[in-house]
Swiss-Prot record:
PANTHER family per the UniProt record, alphabetical: V-TYPE PROTON ATPASE SUBUNIT B
Pfam assignment, any one: ATP-synt_ab_N
Gene3D superfamilies to which the protein is assigned, alphabetical: 3.40.50.12240
Protein known as: V-type ATP synthase beta chain
Any single GO BP term: proton motive force-driven plasma membrane ATP synthesis
HAMAP family to which the protein is assigned, alphabetical: ATP_synth_B_arch
Keyword set, alphabetical order: ATP synthesis, Hydrogen ion transport, Ion transport, Transport
Alphabetical list of SUPFAM superfamilies matching this protein: P-loop containing nucleoside triphosphate hydrolases (SSF52540)
Family, as annotated: Belongs to the ATPase alpha/beta chains family.
Function: Produces ATP from ADP in the presence of a proton gradient across the membrane. The V-type beta chain is a regulatory subunit.
Domain of life (superkingdom): Bacteria
InterPro entries for this protein: ATP-synt_VA_C (IPR055190), ATPase_F1/V1/A1_a/bsu_N (IPR004100), ATPase_F1/V1/A1_a/bsu_nucl-bd (IPR000194), P-loop_NTPase (IPR027417), V-ATPase_su_B/beta (IPR022879)
């Protein structure tokens, strides 16, 4: 039996307080307004009989005498094949002007996958982006963010990864998107040809922050069901997790919580971790690979959001100057696939290229300070130009094997074979024959 309450004692921002009994955290609530409209809310906090609710869609037009009905179940989202190709807002309602979506309602707040049923990641996810495939391999079921400096086109990188991987289903969770960003996701997924296997959960910048915090939960709840019940390999793309954290901060301030670092709630680490831990490779088949975007305000890597994220995830891609910076990027799972799922020369070649590129940066610094350059410095500078143009540029779109071959060609055009520090047996097998004795 549902109990109806009509005594709203406080309205503050998107939060209301009502006197009620028997409420549970996360419980879904229906609010019936005097003008006949209805909206939903969820239980955020309770203290004795005072229950705080976060209202989806805002509290505009709400009065203290409106009916509040506790539904006895958590927030749910529709799951099923009918989701594919569709777009939904932060409350799970379609926003693509198509028919109502039908399927199985599932709760959006579920525990992380049972560790006993997880398996060690072992499959490489190919993106055809050399700075990922060659130097920081993406592994199936990995959770990894893209740390993006201001002004970087991280959304284009996300869509390119989505189009060029072999994921069965792509789920995009957009938070705090401008109309331009939202339109880009819609049009780009159609242009790249994966719109029919893509589900989009979208929170726009003009929407209530309460809806923003639901986006990752809805995206990951659906991904978990697709992976578990249909054995699908699901790629989840979340952008922007800084907007997600800002929404948490706004809600916490409205609730008069004591802030922690830079105004963010003390639960920020846990709030991020519980979402990232949904990434999984399931023993019975199916997987969830999670790539997020975390913008860094003021390019500050010590900002609470990227700082906490770095302790949770399995590496990061550092997007800077329209390139993936090799020195700020890391994949903690790459050793599981390099040389095991890729060519034998992969590890040695990648290490040599990065080592020489690091040396070239020192030579460039000496040149900028007016020091006289040695012949070795000149070789390094010539090498860095080739390396940046043929492997680092995000315009490059080639398979891993071709990237490895190009890496050998760049080395042979810049150095003698004995100068690169690679094992002789690999030199004999892969060094371009025309340059073998150079």
């Amino acid at each position: 039996m549902q109990t109806i309450y009509t005594k709203i004692t406080d309205i503050k921002g998107n939060l209301i307080t009502v006197e009620a009994e028997g409420a549970s955290l996360g419980e879904l609530v229906q609010i019936e307004r005097a003008d006949g409209r209805s909206s939903y809310a969820s239980v955020l906090r309770f203290d004795a009989r005072k229950v705080t609710l976060q209202v989806f869609g805002g509290t505009s037009g709400l009065s203290t005498g409106d009916k509040v009905i506790f539904l006895g179940r958590p927030m749910e989202v529709i799951y099923g094949d009918s989701l594919l190709g569709r777009r939904f807002n932060g409350t799970g309602k379609p926003i693509d002007h198509e028919d109502e979506c039908f399927g199985e309602p599932i709760p959006i707040t579920t525990p992380s996958f049972n560790p006993v049923c997880r398996i060690v990641p072992r499959e490489m996810v190919r993106t055809n982006i050399p700075m990922i495939d060659m130097f920081n391999c993406l592994v199936k079921s990995q959770k990894i963010p893209i740390f993006s400096s201001s002004g970087e086109n991280h959304n284009a990188l996300l869509m390119r990864i989505a189009a060029q991987t072999d994921a069965d289903i792509v789920i995009i969770g957009g938070m705090g998107l401008t109309f331009v960003d939202y339109n880009f996701f819609v049009e780009e997924s159609q242009r790249l040809g994966f719109a029919d296997k893509c589900v989009k959960f979208i929170h726009k910048a003009v929407d209530a922050p309460v809806e923003c915090v639901l986006i990752p939960d809805m995206a990951l709840a659906c991904a978990e069901r697709f992976a578990l019940e249909q054995q699908k390999n699901v790629l989840v793309l979340l952008t922007d997790m800084t907007a997600f954290a800002d929404a948490l901060k706004e809600i916490a301030i409205t609730m008069d919580q004591i802030p922690a670092n830079r105004g963010y709630p003390g639960s920020l680490y846990s709030d991020l971790a519980v979402r990232y831990e949904k990434a999984v490779d399931i023993a019975q088949g199916g997987s969830i690979t999670l790539i997020s975007v975390t913008t860094m305000p003021g390019d500050d890597i010590t900002h609470p959001v990227p700082d906490n994220t770095g302790f949770i995830t399995e590496g990061q891609f550092y997007l800077k100057d329209n390139r993936i910076d090799p020195f700020g990027s890391l994949s903690r799972l790459k050793q599981l696939v390099i040389g095991k799922k890729t060519r034998e020369d992969h590890g040695d070649l990648a290490n040599a290229l990065i080592r020489l590129y690091a040396d070239s940066r020192k030579s460039a610094e000496r040149m900028s300070m007016g020091f006289k350059l040695s012949n070795w410095d000149k070789k390094l500078l010539a090498f860095s130009e080739l390396f940046e143009a043929r492997l680092m540029s995000l315009e490059v779109n080639i398979p891993l094997e071709e990237a490895l071959d190009i890496g050998w060609k760049i080395l042979s055009q810049s150095f003698h074979s004995e100068e690169v520090g690679i094992k002789e047996q690999l030199i004999q097998k892969y060094w371009p024959k025309a340059c073998l004795h150079k």
